[in-house]
């Protein structure tokens, strides 16, 4: 059985002991005493950078996440797959009637192409029976036929085929993003409070699967006079990935979560710019899998910054059910 990727249930979450005592926390944290945060720039260039970031973010999502047309789960064994109804797995998108056969054994998926069908794997002729690397890796194997791509996707212990069609229904219907006005008060300086020992967080995602992330501490900051903490995941050295929601979730913003990324400085501080808080792709595409915030990342404060909710509600597909 494949090890789960992203917590034992969020309700059971308990933060590990922090590397500093509570009495010293405020003294060691930027912004506890109020006033302007040192080392935090705000000028026309910062505003332009946020505007440029938002434009690039939407363009990236339009090119990538908006093109996902389907997520098709695979049980152990061998399955025919293609667009025709007589396949074991009927794929969405403008694919051939039969693409080939996918064999699931343990935590691997092997692919045998249908004879005579024109397709490539990573731009080359396919090797029958080759094992496909899933999209958790930077070098995932990509099957392409008729301009439509297929990759293996893992969510928790389950494996699926993820189909992308740049000319498909979802790509054509993508409605773009809307944002709160850029605001200086939502760009704050935080201090990273490191745990005594790094650990893994097992996080429930929107499909009910469990994924695993590395966590090394919390970020403490002051927002609108409130001292708050968020626990980021560490996806690479000094890069903080924060999954949170707040008192606007479900009304002004997407109900499940928003994401925020930040870079950790050598002095232990980081800029949290909530003007760049953004929705996960599951806010507009039901065939994506997204983590749910840890309990301590569910803020009672209202964060009126960053991306607003998508203009139409998107429900997870029936195939998401466990």
Residue spans of the language-model regions?
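Bacterial N-terminal signal peptides that target proteins for export
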Residues: 2-21
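Bacterial signal peptide processing site
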Residues: 33-35
């Amino acid at each position: 059985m494949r090890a789960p990727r992203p917590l034992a249930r969020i309700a059971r979450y308990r933060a590990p002991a922090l590397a500093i005592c509570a009495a010293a926390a405020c003294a060691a944290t930027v912004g506890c005493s109020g006033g302007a945060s040192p080392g935090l720039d705000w000028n026309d260039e910062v505003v332009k950078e946020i505007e440029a970031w938002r434009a690039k973010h939407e363009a990236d999502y339009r090119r990538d996440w908006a093109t996902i047309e389907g997520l098709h789960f695979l049980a152990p064994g061998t399955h025919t797959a293609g667009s025709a109804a007589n396949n074991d797995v009927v794929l969405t998108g403008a694919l051939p009637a039969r693409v080939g056969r996918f064999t699931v054994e343990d935590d691997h998926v092997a692919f045998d192409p249908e004879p005579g069908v024109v397709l490539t794997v990573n731009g080359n002729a396919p090797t029958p029976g080759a094992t496909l690397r899933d999209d958790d890796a930077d070098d995932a194997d990509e099957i392409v036929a008729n301009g439509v791509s297929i990759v293996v996707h893992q969510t928790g212990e389950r494996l699926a085929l993820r189909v992308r069609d740049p000319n498909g229904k979802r790509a054509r219907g993508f409605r773009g993003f809307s944002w709160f006005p850029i605001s200086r008060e939502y760009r704050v300086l935080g201090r990273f409070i490191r745990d005594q020992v790094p650990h893994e967080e097992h996080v429930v995602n929107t499909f009910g699967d469990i994924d695993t992330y590395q966590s090394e501490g919390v970020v403490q900051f002051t927002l609108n006079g409130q001292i708050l903490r968020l626990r980021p995941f560490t996806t690479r050295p000094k890069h903080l990935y924060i999954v949170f929601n707040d008192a606007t979730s479900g009304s002004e913003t997407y109900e499940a979560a928003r994401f925020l990324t930040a870079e950790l400085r050598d002095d232990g501080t980081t800029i949290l710019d909530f003007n760049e808080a953004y929705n996960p792709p599951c806010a507009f595409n039901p065939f994506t899998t997204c983590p749910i915030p840890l309990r301590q990342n569910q803020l009672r404060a209202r964060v009126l910054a960053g991306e607003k909710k998508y203009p139409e509600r998107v429900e997870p597909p029936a195939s998401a059910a466990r």
